Amino acid sequence: MIKTGKFVYEPGEHEAEKASNSYLMSLIAVIAGLPFPIVNLIATVIFFIANKKGTYFVRWHCIQALLSQFSLFFMNSFAFWWTIYILFGEKTITNNFMAYLITVFFFNLLEFIATIYTAINTRKGMHIEWLFYGNLTNIFCKA
């Protein structure tokens, strides 16, 4: 799921810290706005906008964090609104609903662990590429 490799250049201490903060921003947003999926995405977008003129290393990791949050946003939003519909509508809890919640929980947990791992290692100046998101980030982020 995660590939560690060399970056185009050796990032400085300040760059590594900013790149690491792009992942920490999403973790802090999870704690602050847990029931609302949009909070996480907005926090990551704001951090990206604040750093879009930053160095290539910082921009690259901001984009990877943003892409991972963007895909989770759709999964979490669907789970959130389905739950609201069950609580306030005339629907009942079904096996499909429970299976979807378990799947969403699993993907959120996996992303949470990967984010912590990436934040720690990016802070050390290592370049971490996530499966799928790393390739997309390479397409979106130009040197």
Each language-model region and where it sits:
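Membrane-interface extramembranous regions at the lipid-water interface
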Residues: 1-33, 39-66, 119-143
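Hydrophobic alpha-helical transmembrane segments in multi-pass membrane proteins
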Residues: 18-41, 64-115
